[in-house]
Amino acid sequence: MGIYDHAFHFAGGGQRYVAELAQILQDRYDITYIVNKDISLEKYREWFDIDLSKCKLKIIKIPFFEERGIYIIDECMIIHQDENPFDVIKNESINYDIFINANMLTKVRPLSSLSAFICHFPDKDRGKFFNVERYDYVITNSSYTTHWLKQKWGLDCTLRLYPPVNMFNDTSDLGEKDKMILSVARFETGGSKKQLEMIDTFLDLCKKDKRLKKEWKLILAGGTPKVNPYYDKVKQRAKRVSNIEIRANLNNYEIKQLYSKASIFWHACGLNEIDPRLIEHFGMTTVEAMQNYCVPVVIDGGGQREIVEHGISGFRFTSKEELKSYTLKLINDDYLREKMAKNAYNRSKKFTKEEFEKIALEFFSDIENRLRGGEPMEVNS
């Protein structure tokens, strides 16, 4: 099996998703990770606590990007080329029984016996050298992504495989929760995770309810590069009240501690957006919070609709006014908050690593069957 990830040298959600899959399959297949930049498999143990020690690594540098000193492999840069620079990966793919395109590089044509394209979201238009329709299987991470796969590329999904989420914490206890609202999301330079809007909402709540201002706090946690004007703006606005805390670049243990203490979880990515690319395609941090008895109050859009059952395991909002209303409802009703926290915890079990592994192994058993000349079985989609 060959797994190609042109962005393997970045610590992102897409990389983690496929690395989790590789970790499951490495005992079953001879796996080679195909990458374009210098990196070691050991990095994934450091970044994600994922052991890929049974996989091999093959670095194939693409001359088009190397000659220009480009670190980020961006397929949009090659549209004016007469020949496809990614043909070097196409030629490599013939060496494998199964070839997996792990991170949506649409311009790689597969030549393996069987092939799978993993689509986290179809954010690019069809264009020159587009080859996704040549893959035997297309895997998506949510029904939301599946819908837009059909809308944008006219392609059907073979398998919907929700990301594996494993943030269960023995220290999380409903009886030990703080009066804390938590959000965990990257501080994107363009502000797509809506931290400023969440601060403004919390400031409005503090003005409306003096008890809330005195007893509750908002913590915004997430990663940020060293130079990030948006993050600077978030920090500045948070200074308006003393009960807003900004926590950047925390490690996994520190994030777990926040989840274990938080009572309510906010996720606002997609607020006031109409571009489907800017709405959360799944929402792993929402599930992480639910696994720690945090009641989610999240945007009513994208993959969040598949995670949170409105009024049962949390609330979904469409405006800042609704975000305030649902939050106050939870703050002022301890019984409701505890009931929803239990429901959220139970709901989160749908998105566990065990469920991911079960569905993935069933799917690859089907692929093995096809390689041996058998009829393909029906898979979950």
What are these regions (language model features)?
Residues 35-39, 215-232, 248:
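Glycosyltransferase donor-sugar binding loop
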Residues 222, 231-256:
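Nucleotide-activated donor-binding/catalytic signature segment of Leloir-type glycosyltransferases, i.e.
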Residues 260-281, 294:
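Acidic donor-binding loop of glycosyltransferase active sites
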Residues 310-321, 329-335:
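Conserved acidic donor-binding segment of nucleotide-sugar-dependent glycosyltransferases
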Residues 139, 172-193, 199-206, 219:
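Conserved donor-binding/catalytic core segment of Leloir-type glycosyltransferases
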Residues 124, 134-171:
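Donor nucleotide-sugar binding/catalytic pocket of nucleotide-sugar-dependent glycosyltransferases
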Residues 329, 336-350, 358-362:
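A short, well-ordered alpha-helix in the C-terminal region of glycosyltransferases
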Residues 286-291, 295-298, 308:
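Short hydrophobic beta-strand element within catalytic cores of glycosyltransferases
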